[in-house]
Amino acid sequence: MEERYSRQIRFKQIGEEGQKRLADSHVLIVGAGALGTAGAEGLSRAGVGTITIIDRDYVEWSNLQRQQLYTESDAKLRMPKAMAAKEHLSAINSEIHIEAYVTEGTAETLEPLIEKADVVIDATDNFETRMLINDLAQKTKTPWVYGACVSSQGMFMTVIPGETPCLSCLFEQIPVGGATCDTAGIIPPAVHIVSAYQQAEALKLLTGQKEAIQRGFVTFDVWNNSHMKINVNHVRREECPSCGANAVYPYLQDWNTPKAAVLCGRDTVQVRSESLKRIPKQELIKRLKTIGKVEANAFLLHIFYEDFRIVIFNDGRALVHGTNDVKEANSVLARVIGL
Amino acid sequence: MIKILLFAGLAEQAGTQAIEIDMEQATTDEIKASLKEQYGLESIDTAMIAVNESYVKENTSVSSGDTVAIIPPVSGG
């Protein structure tokens, strides 16, 4: 252990004591895409004792350009990302414990995992799951690091329950209709900057150095050379439904979760979502045009994406044709709309 | 002069990252409405607003010399 972590122990803010604390720590990584694999690899090498990783997808060829743990063989075999990640992480560091879950991150699946974690790394590709993490983190008093990236841009913010503002303080509603990696593309440096910050924040929290965390919301564009830290200290609200005095954890409530149903015999999944309703239709059409031909009428719009046909109704329903799997349908909608 | 900084998709849609508005005083809602109309930035309503690098939630007055950053949250990961 001494030799393996010697350069990290020599870093005086970590030292022997910090390294021991890392070995006794447990990090939950939600999502095993670009941010998830970068964060998992970094924290595994750093010697975090237990890493839990949860993801609903399998490895595809378009992932290899930035999702650093995966190989061509994973893509050929369509390996579930969580399992492939576990295999590679175990080869990188056999001294730590990796738990992998191939499932969708929901209130039910995430709550027991967050309860056991010391820090949560957000590596999801959608705001529905982020808001769930935000509520569960408040409920279980677990610090977490929001992170997101698209094209050459990224942003992150560390949330410490009881101390910093939470994501609901910043966004009263789920931010919808933002660019996704499938519509606006993504370059690896944007991923790695966000992940590097997330890992640094995790190392500070796990070694008991809360005072060192970045207090603020950071956003950057590595292509256009901009970087801005926004002061958010005053944004914490007493009446915040997620972290205020009378928190109700709105995203853990049934009415707020997207409803998905398999339509029998139709090879179709229907997803009903309150936030889908709020995306301006023209905006959605403009965005989806980068993926393929969008056909729209007064009631719905229609687009082909990979092997799927997606129909989005004005009333907040989306039909994903070409699958009977709710997980897969949610994954397609996350990639296409960021839902 | 009020300086507007656009981030992420908003900058791409507007074709510029920085815009200067020749006004002494305006509110953040007025600025958003005018950018929405001028550049067709439909998604501006869900964006975060920071005035002089400090987050503002409510409609806020800004004056000449202030910098207003408009940041749409991104969801990729």
From Swiss-Prot, chain A:
Q: What is its EC number?
A: 2.7.7.80
Known catalytic reactions: [molybdopterin-synthase sulfur-carrier protein]-C-terminal Gly-Gly + ATP + H(+) = [molybdopterin-synthase sulfur-carrier protein]-C-terminal Gly-Gly-AMP + diphosphate
Output a single Gene Ontology CC term carried by this record.
Answer: cytoplasm
- Annotated binding of Zn(2+), by residue: C166, C169, C240, C243
| An example Gene Ontology molecular-function term | ubiquitin-like modifier activating enzyme activity
Matching InterPro entries: ThiF/MoeB/HesA, ThiF_NAD_FAD-bd, Ubiquitin-activating_enz
Query: Which parts pass through the membrane?
Result: none
- Is Metal-binding among the key words of this record? yes
- Subunit notes for this chain? Homodimer. Forms a stable heterotetrameric complex of 2 MoeB and 2 MoaD during adenylation of MoaD.
Q: Which family does it belong to?
A: Belongs to the HesA/MoeB/ThiF family.
- Outline what the protein does: Catalyzes the adenylation by ATP of the carboxyl group of the C-terminal glycine of sulfur carrier protein MoaD.
Can you say what this protein is called? Molybdopterin-synthase adenylyltransferase
Q: What is the phylogenetic placement of the source species in the record?
A: Bacteria, Bacillati, Bacillota, Bacilli, Bacillales
Q: Which gene encodes it?
A: moeB
UniProtKB/Swiss-Prot annotation, chain B:
Listed pathway(s):
Cofactor biosynthesis; molybdopterin biosynthesis
Disulfide-bond pairs as recorded: none
Give the GO molecular function terms.
nucleotide binding
Record note on modification: C-terminal thiocarboxylation occurs in 2 steps, it is first acyl-adenylated (-COAMP) by MoeB, then thiocarboxylated (-COSH) by IscS.
- GO BP annotation list: Mo-molybdopterin cofactor biosynthetic process
Which Gene3D superfamilies does its entry note?
A: 3.10.20.30
Q: Which InterPro entries match?
A: Beta-grasp_dom_sf (IPR012675), MOCS2A (IPR044672), Mopterin_synth/thiamin_S_b (IPR016155), ThiS/MoaD-like (IPR003749)
Modification Glycyl adenylate, positions: G77
Alphabetized SUPFAM superfamilies for the sequence: MoaD/ThiS (SSF54285)
Q: How does it assemble?
A: Heterotetramer of 2 MoaD subunits and 2 MoaE subunits. Forms a stable heterotetrameric complex of 2 MoaD and 2 MoeB during adenylation of MoaD by MoeB. During catalysis MoaD shuttles between the two heterotetrameric complexes.
- Role played: Involved in sulfur transfer in the conversion of molybdopterin precursor Z to molybdopterin.
List, alphabetically, the PANTHER family matched: MOLYBDOPTERIN SYNTHASE SULFUR CARRIER SUBUNIT
Which protein family is it in?
Answer: Belongs to the MoaD family.
Question: What name does UniProt use for this protein?
Answer: Molybdopterin synthase sulfur carrier subunit
Q: Which organism is it from?
A: Bacillus subtilis (strain 168)
Q: Which gene encodes it?
A: moaD
